[in-house]
Swiss-Prot record:
Protein name (database record): Large ribosomal subunit protein bL25
Keywords: Ribonucleoprotein, Ribosomal protein, RNA-binding, rRNA-binding
InterPro entries cross-referenced by the UniProt entry: Rbsml_bL25/Gln-tRNA_synth_N, Ribosomal_bL25/Gln-tRNA_synth, Ribosomal_bL25_b-dom, Ribosomal_bL25_C, Ribosomal_bL25_long, Ribosomal_L25_dom, Ribosomal_uL5_bac-type
Organism: Syntrophobacter fumaroxidans (strain DSM 10017 / MPOB)
Protein's GO biological process: translation
Amino acid sequence: MDIELVAQTRTKSGKGPARALRRNEMVPAVLYGPKAETVSLSVPRQRLERLLRDMGEESKLLRLTVEGDGTAEMKQVLIREVQVHPVRRRFLHVDFYEVPLDHPIVVEVPVELLGEPVGVKKGGTLNLIQRMLSVRCLPGEIPEKVQVDVSKLDIGSSIQVEQLRTIVPFELTDDGGMAVVNVVAPEGAGKEDAEAAEE
């Protein structure tokens, strides 16, 4: 599915013009990248809100059409940062990063767990420690999920990034020793074992 958004160039900056944009249901934005000049933009608030809701936590390429001075130019971008008012929860600003399609980038990709762990069947608890992992890939090859098979995970065991590197078809850039998911003993199990040993 193509994800598209139309932005307008803007020449005025500062708090006053930014507030005026928000009153008109527009969100101030900026476009930048390694091969592009920084451009100030504005985007429709409702369209941005719907787009972010549909995207969820996934890092996806966005087709941003930049309109201004009677011209329109399409850019391939990622959303790098969205600033939200801490109380009113309205959008304050958004950063778009223009990506060269032939240059690898690092993005955050959500983790998806597959299967029921052996340890859970024994009464243990499954803990997802890292909900997102860093992936290096070309912009057109961003995976939707990092799938992790946890069916063989027993109580007291974990799966680390290093173990996933031999399984997934893309590069993981997080520390190899970082635990992604584990299964822990049921609460109170250690106490019960100690009491049984004393008896």
